[in-house]
């Protein structure tokens, strides 16, 4: 995200980011060599820098690639070494083990409100204290656009709070430091929050451009605003917030006013069926409202249509050039095609096309190239290289001086649930395919697949005849990791790392080598690892390639959001839901049934498609919660292979094994707690249920 580079370039920093609802300390944005806040809006350059600081809160987000955050590390997608629970800023174990406490929660609550305050401070200064130079330098329409960007960010930060904490206080203006505690805001009803955020996004979209290019990419657009509104409304229509909230006795201390004024334009038709005159002290509605799904469906359709037209978006991989990008990046040589068991012969056109699709899918999430128009919004993660290394194999090769080993941490370990819920090559789950004789029987999954070749004989049947996304993003014993990861000599162009997950001499378990960095399940992930990533022979330096931005909103989400809404509305919309699901599966090279399934089956298919397509992109934490299925997915035991044994033979390694960590679910985890201090100092605030 080029914005962050611009923050440094303009030399404008945040020096007193302490805004929160308790102390009401204000934000002070002061250029380091200037006198005070008014200088922040003195010129066009300084004001633009001030605006960029409003985006800095995105770096405080639960980044999809931040594996130790609650957002990722607590889900059933992958497991981490238990020692990583002690890392600075690690909260994954609190949510995975049901240990989260209001005495010491993560700091996202204060961070988001801090940046909401930052945005309102920007709005106040631009409106009330623009410098004379700024007034002369402003380009036509620029002021309105910058204000719209701040309003977009205010809406986003409120949504980021809402999806994690449930009903929240809505901040509508800059809160001065002198505000007495009796005037602090309490939580608002969940639906009120949703309708206010949707309204703010509508207003912001009116003055935002549909696209941005070059150094402006990553700043707010109307395409982003419409896509975010669609997501907000889909979340609100989902079971947890639409009749299945488990804590009916959880009430507010203050009344939430009515919200019918927020229903304008296309939403006006829902004013009476969704809006209210007054919410009283209720925090979450206890009844189901089908109109929420209809409203969400309409917003999702409009967001998708706008993205495809005004937004200029398309699914990556739908043009021929997408399939051959690896040739531009790595060279026009078959050696760079990925290894896929059973598809070794590149002279067979079907094999070649399959492998090119695998490479395309790796590039889709690892980089943003000028022709990749799928990424609607992306984030440059903090310390990207170290987070990429967290998923790369350890102990790859000895460096040039033979005194140390190059490699990553091997730690991001996909669970067996993950491995078993990517599709087969025929587009069905392995268990379903096994029941019809179209895949190895479940009893044979951990047996050798009979693959010939150098170090390939230990590939198991579960890892053969799988879909392209499986080979793009997963890695397994006997398979390849990366494309040119090993540069084992000064003249070497690089080659893949052939995984040996069973032995300490390979990439397996060995606490003497590292007491905290090891693989937990016997599987690894290559998602986000650029095909050009490489460890260099001399010194073992890691070159990650182009690893940014990390997806926040992709066009594929708009298709699947719409499909989910259509499937839940049902009726004639089921066929449309299947068609939108098919768009994503076609790009992935996965066949789709032509017969419209029954409603519950189709919803299940869409849910699993989200699991695969958005694996490790930060959706799973929120999806399982909004579906009200926490116990089903996060309360069950988590499994891998018998990988945490040193130098284990094939037969003992390939055994279904329960991960030895205390994973637990409690329904209180549907909401995150806020700090007790917030409740003690704010007489209007109620703590999340169960804390």
Name every feature range the model reports, one short phrase each:
Residues 43-61, 66, 83-165, 180-217, ...:
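Conserved, well-structured interaction surfaces
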Residues 24-71, 460-464, 474, 675-691:
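Membrane-proximal, proline-rich intrinsically disordered regions
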Residues 147, 154, 229, 236, ...:
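Structural register within alpha-helical repeat arrays
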Residues 24, 112-115, 196, 256-291, ...:
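Long, intrinsically disordered, low-complexity segments
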Residues 133, 140, 167-187, 240-295:
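Short coil/linker segments at helix-helix boundaries
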Residues 162-163, 167-169, 232-244, 568-571:
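Short coil/turn linking the two alpha-helices of tandem helical-hairpin repeats
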Residues 1-33:
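Bacterial Sec-dependent N-terminal signal peptides
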């Amino acid at each position: 995200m080029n914005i962050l580079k611009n923050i440094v370039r303009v030399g404008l920093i945040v020096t007193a980011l302490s805004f929160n609802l308790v102390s009401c300390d204000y934000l002070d944005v002061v250029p380091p060599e200037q006198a005070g806040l008014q200088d922040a809006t003195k010129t066009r350059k300084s004001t633009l820098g001030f605006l960029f600081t409003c985006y800095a809160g995105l770096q405080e987000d639960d980044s999809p690639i931040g594996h130790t955050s609650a957002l990722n590390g607590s889900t059933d997608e992958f497991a981490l070494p238990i020692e990583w629970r002690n890392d600075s800023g690690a909260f994954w174990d609190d949510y995975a083990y049901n240990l989260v406490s209001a005495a010491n929660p993560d700091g996202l609550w204060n961070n988001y409100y801090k940046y909401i305050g930052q945005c309102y401070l920007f709005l106040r200064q631009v409106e009330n204290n623009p410098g004379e130079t700024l007034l002369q330098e402003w380009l036509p329409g620029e002021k309105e656009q910058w204000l719209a960007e701040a309003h977009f960010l205010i809406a986003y930060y409120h949504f980021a709070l809402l999806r994690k904490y449930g009903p929240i206080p809505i901040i509508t203006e800059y809160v001065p430091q002198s505000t007495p505690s009796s005037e602090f805001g309490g939580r608002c009803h969940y639906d009120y929050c949703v309708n206010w955020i949707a309204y703010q996004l509508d207003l912001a979209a009116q003055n935002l451009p549909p696209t941005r290019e070059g150094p402006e990419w990553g700043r707010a657009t109307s395409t982003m605003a419409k896509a975010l509104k669609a997501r907000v409304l889909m979340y609100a229509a989902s079971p947890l917030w639409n009749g299945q909230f488990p804590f009916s006795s959880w009430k507010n201390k203050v009344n939430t006013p009515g919200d019918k004024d927020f229903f304008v334009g296309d939403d006006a038709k829902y004013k009476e069926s969704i809006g209210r005159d007054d919410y009283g002290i209720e925090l979450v509605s206890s009844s189901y409202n089908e109109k929420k799904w209809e409203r969400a469906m309409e917003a999702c359709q409009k967001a998708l249509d706008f993205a495809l037209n005004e937004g200029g978006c398309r699914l990556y991989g739908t043009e021929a050039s997408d399939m051959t990008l690896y040739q531009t990046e790595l060279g026009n040589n078959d050696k760079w095609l990925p290894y896929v068991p059973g598809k070794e012969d590149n002279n067979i056109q079907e094999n070649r096309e399959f492998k090119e699709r695998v490479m395309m899918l790796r590039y889709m999430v690892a980089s943003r190239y000028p022709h990749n128009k799928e990424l609607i919004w992306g984030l440059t993660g903090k310390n990207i290289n170290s987070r990429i290394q967290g998923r790369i194999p350890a102990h790859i090769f000895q460096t040039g001086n033979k005194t140390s080993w190059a490699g990553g941490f091997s730690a991001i370990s996909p669970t067996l649930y993950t491995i078993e819920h990517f599709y087969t090559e025929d587009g069905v789950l392995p268990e379903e395919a096994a029941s019809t004789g179209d895949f190895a029987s479940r009893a044979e999954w951990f047996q050798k697949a009979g693959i010939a070749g150098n170090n390939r004989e230990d590939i198991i049947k579960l890892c053969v005849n799988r879909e392209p996304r499986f080979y793009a993003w997963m890695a397994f014993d006997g398979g390849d990791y990366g494309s040119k990861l090993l540069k084992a000599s000064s003249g070497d162009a690089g080659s893949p790392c052939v995984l040996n997950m069973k032995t300490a001499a390979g990439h397996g378990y060995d606490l003497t080598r590292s007491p905290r960095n090891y693989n937990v399940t016997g599987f690894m992930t290559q998602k986000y690892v650029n095909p050009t990533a490489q460890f260099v022979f001399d010194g073992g330096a890691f070159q990650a390639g182009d690893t940014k931005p990390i997806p926040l909103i992709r066009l594929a989400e708009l298709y699947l959001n719409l499909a989910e809404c259509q499937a839940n509305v049902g009726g004639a919309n089921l066929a449309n839901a299947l068609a939108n699901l098919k768009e994503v599966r076609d790009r992935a090279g996965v066949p789709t049934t032509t017969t419209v399934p029954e409603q519950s089956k189709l919803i299940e298919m869409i849910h699993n498609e989200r699991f695969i397509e958005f694996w490790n992109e930060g959706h799973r934490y929120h999806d399982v919660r909004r579906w009200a299925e926490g116990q089903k997915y996060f309360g069950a035991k988590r499994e891998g292979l018998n990988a945490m044994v040193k130098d284990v033979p094939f037969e003992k390694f390939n055994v279904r094994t329960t991960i030895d960590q205390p994973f637990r679910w409690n329904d209180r985890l549907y909401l995150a707690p806020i700090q007790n201090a917030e409740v003690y100092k704010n007489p209007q605030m109620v703590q999340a249920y169960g804390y």
